[in-house]
C-alpha cells in the first residue's frame, strides 16, 4: 500500500510506543512511552528550553526532567501526556499529517468504555483523522500468527494478559490480567544484583539493568535443577561490561529473574504464575473450545522473549491440563512486535475497509460509536 494513503498503525504500550504504516512488516518508530518536564524552569537562559520532551529525547535528558509514564498497566491514565505522545508519533516520528490518514489504535483487553471513547474523541477532534479504529492488542497478535482462534499470553512492560479468542472475538469473561511484567522483572533483577554487591538504584542505572535482563536472562526448564547446576559449577556465569568499563559477573540471577513469571511469590505477590493464569483463562471458556485453545497458545510481547520460555510453558501447562490433551505453544520470532504487525495486516485487508469509523459517522453519533463498530 502507498505511504500516501496508507493507514497509520499505532500500538501504545506501557513501556514502548510502536508506530508505522499499514502494509509494512515492522514498525518504523519504536520509542519509550514517556513524557518528561523540566524539574527547574529556565535554569539555562536562551537554551530555547521546551516545556516537555517525549520518548528518546526525554530519556536522554532524564537528568534534568521529571519523567511520567501516561500508560500504566496497559491503560491510559493521563490524557494530556497521551496526547503529547500521539502528537510526537505523527509529527516527529512518522512525519505525517494525521488528517490525511486513517489511524488504527490498539487498546488493552478490558479497557474501560470511557477510555475507548476518549481515544476516539481525541483522534477526531484534536487530530482530525478521516477515519479510525480501535483493536484489542491480543487479538492483533493472534492475527499476526495467522490464526483467528487461540489463547494469547501477552506480556509487555507494564501488564500481562491471557486472552482467549474464538473466531476473531476476545471472550471478555475469560480474560485474566496479571500486574506482573517487564518493569517488575527489571526491578527484581536490580534487587538481586544488589544482594550480590552491585548497586543499581537510579533511573539511569535501571536502564542498564534492563539491558542486562534483555541480553543475559533466560527461563530454566527445571528451576531447582538449574539452581543446583549454578551452585556446583560456573558454567552458567556470564560477564557484562557496564558503560564505565567495569565488568560484572552474573550467575543464577540470569534465570532467577524471569522465574518470577512462574513464581510471583519471588516478588512478594500472591498471584498465580503465567502458566496457571493461562490455564485458568482456558478453564473459564466453554468446554467445547478448550481443545482449540490448548493447541493454539500464542506468546506475544517483549516479556515473552526469554530463551526457554516456550518449552517451560509447554511443560507447565501439560502438567495442569488433562493428560490426553494436545498442547502447542506458539512463540513467533517477531513476537516483540506482533501486536503492531497484526494491526498492519488488519488495516491493509480489503475486507477491513468498511470497518473504519469515519469522521462522518463520528459527527453523527459521537464517541459512543466506538462500541458499535469496534469489538
Curated annotation (Swiss-Prot):
InterPro entries, per the entry: Actin, Actin/actin-like_CS, Actin_CS, ATPase_NBD
N-acetylaspartate: modified positions: 2
Enzyme class: hydrolase
Record localization: Cytoplasm, Cytoskeleton
UniProt key word Nucleus: no
Post-translational modification remark: Oxidation of Met-44 and Met-47 by MICALs (mical1, mical2 or mical3) to form methionine sulfoxide promotes actin filament depolymerization. Mical1 and mical2 produce the (R)-S-oxide form. The (R)-S-oxide form is reverted by msrb1 and msrb2, which promote actin repolymerization.
Entry annotated with the keyword Hydrolase: yes
GO cellular component: cytoskeleton; dense body; focal adhesion; plasma membrane
Primary localization: cytoplasm
Tele-methylhistidine modifications at: 73
UniProt-listed SUPFAM superfamilies: Actin-like ATPase domain
PTM sites of type N-acetylmethionine: 1
Keywords: Acetylation, ATP-binding, Cytoplasm, Cytoskeleton, Hydrolase, Methylation, Nucleotide-binding, Oxidation
GO MF annotation, one: hydrolase activity
Listed Pfam families: Actin (PF00022)
Catalysed reaction, written as an equation: ATP + H2O = ADP + phosphate + H(+)
Enzyme Commission number: 3.6.4.-
PTM-bearing positions, type Methionine (R)-sulfoxide: 44, 47
Other facts: In vertebrates 3 main groups of actin isoforms, alpha, beta and gamma have been identified. The alpha actins are found in muscle tissues and are a major constituent of the contractile apparatus. The beta and gamma actins coexist in most cell types as components of the cytoskeleton and as mediators of internal cell motility.
Subunit structure: Polymerization of globular actin (G-actin) leads to a structural filament (F-actin) in the form of a two-stranded helix. Each actin can bind to 4 others.
Role summary: Actins are highly conserved proteins that are involved in various types of cell motility and are ubiquitously expressed in all eukaryotic cells.
Family per similarity comment: Belongs to the actin family.
Name this polypeptide is given: Actin, cytoplasmic 2
Amino acid at each position: 500500500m502507498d505511504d500516501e494513503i496508507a493507514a497509520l498503525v499505532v500500538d501504545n504500550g506501557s513501556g514502548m510506543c510502536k508506530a508505522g504504516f499499514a502494509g509494512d512488516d515492522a514498525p518504523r518508530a519504536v520509542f519509550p512511552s514517556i513524557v518528561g518536564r523540566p524539574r527547574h524552569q529556565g535554569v539555562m537562559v536562551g537554551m530555547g528550553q521546551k516545556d516537555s520532551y517525549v520518548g528518546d529525547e526525554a530519556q536522554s535528558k532524564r537528568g534534568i526532567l521529571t519523567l511520567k509514564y501516561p500508560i500504566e498497566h496497559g491503560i491510559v491514565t493521563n490524557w494530556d501526556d497521551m496526547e503529547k505522545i500521539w502528537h510526537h508519533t505523527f509529527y516527529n516520528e512518522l512525519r505525517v499529517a494525521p488528517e490525511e490518514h486513517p489511524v488504527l489504535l490498539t487498546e488493552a483487553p478490558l479497557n474501560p468504555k470511557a477510555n475507548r471513547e476518549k481515544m476516539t474523541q481525541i483522534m477526531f477532534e484534536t487530530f482530525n483523522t478521516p477515519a479510525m479504529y480501535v483493536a484489542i492488542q491480543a487479538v492483533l497478535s493472534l492475527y499476526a500468527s495467522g490464526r483467528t482462534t487461540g489463547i494469547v499470553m501477552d506480556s509487555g512492560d507494564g501488564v500481562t494478559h491471557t486472552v482467549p479468542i474464538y473466531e476473531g472475538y476476545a471472550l471478555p469473561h475469560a480474560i485474566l490480567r496479571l500486574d506482573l511484567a517487564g518493569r517488575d522483572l527489571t526491578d527484581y533483577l536490580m534487587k538481586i544484583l544488589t544482594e550480590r554487591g552491585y548497586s543499581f538504584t537510579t533511573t539511569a542505572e535501571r536502564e542498564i539493568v534492563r539491558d542486562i535482563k534483555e541480553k543475559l536472562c533466560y527461563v530454566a526448564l527445571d528451576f531447582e535443577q538449574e539452581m543446583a547446576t549454578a551452585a556446583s559449577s560456573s558454567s552458567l556465569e556470564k560477564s557484562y561490561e557496564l558503560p564505565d568499563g567495569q565488568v560484572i559477573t552474573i550467575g543464577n540471577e540470569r534465570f532467577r529473574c524471569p522465574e518470577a513469571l512462574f513464581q510471583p511469590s519471588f516478588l512478594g505477590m500472591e498471584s498465580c504464575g503465567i502458566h496457571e493464569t493461562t490455564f485458568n483463562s482456558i478453564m473459564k471458556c466453554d468446554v467445547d473450545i478448550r481443545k482449540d485453545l490448548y493447541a493454539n497458545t500464542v506468546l506475544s510481547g517483549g516479556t515473552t522473549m526469554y530463551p526457554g520460555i516456550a518449552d517451560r510453558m509447554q511443560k507447565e501447562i501439560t502438567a495442569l491440563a488433562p493428560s490426553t490433551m494436545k498442547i502447542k505453544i506458539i512463540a513467533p520470532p517477531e513476537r516483540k512486535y506482533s501486536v503492531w504487525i497484526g494491526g498492519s495486516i488488519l488495516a491493509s485487508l480489503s475486507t477491513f475497509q468498511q470497518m473504519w469509523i469515519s469522521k462522518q459517522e463520528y459527527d453523527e453519533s459521537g464517541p459512543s460509536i466506538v462500541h458499535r463498530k469496534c469489538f
